Amino acid sequence: MSDMEIRIRPVGVVRSPFKTRSDAPAQGRFSSEESEIHIFPEYLDAVDGLELFSHIFVLYWLHLAERNVLRVVPRGKRKKRGVFSTRAPARPNPVGLCLVELLECGEILRVRGLDALDGSPVIDIKPYYEDIDSLGF
């Protein structure tokens, strides 16, 4: 099974003020910066109805991340752990997930709180449903 290959085509691209990893916040929810997600023309029909939501999940490819790293020292810690137990961008399949506020909807989505670097390919977008996505903490 380890020789299985998956192909994913981006549905859009991030345009953000963050050009390098050091520019980006540790977590998007701690940022008030606005970014844009430019949806590719062939996927514009998929945006229909998204305007009904105040928040969305953005799945994106961490295109500048290292992919050969399996253990890292998490931020603020001293001991290495496996990347699956961290939020580190370096990982075998560097997929980013960020819950953002949707400010404007169209062929360009304007969002607040996205931690993706400028030029990051967007893999998917999903609406946030408070009743199923929140654990109520």
From Swiss-Prot:
Domain (TsaA-like): residue spans on this chain: 8-137
UniProtKB keywords: S-adenosyl-L-methionine
InterPro entries: TrmO-like_N, UPF0066_cons_site, YaeB-like, YaeB-like_sf, YaeB_N_sf
Keyword flag Ligase: no
Keyword S-adenosyl-L-methionine in record: yes
Residues annotated for S-adenosyl-L-methionine binding in this entry: 25-27, 63-64, 87, 97, 117-120
Domain of life (superkingdom): Archaea
One protein family per Pfam: TrmO_N
Cystine pairs: none
Protein family (similarity comment): Belongs to the tRNA methyltransferase O family.
NCBIfam families listed in its UniProt record: tRNA_TsaA
Name of this chain's protein: Probable S-adenosyl-L-methionine-binding protein MTH_1797
Organism: Methanothermobacter thermautotrophicus (strain ATCC 29096 / DSM 1053 / JCM 10044 / NBRC 100330 / Delta H)
Upper taxonomic lineage: Archaea, Methanobacteriati, Methanobacteriota, Methanomada group, Methanobacteria
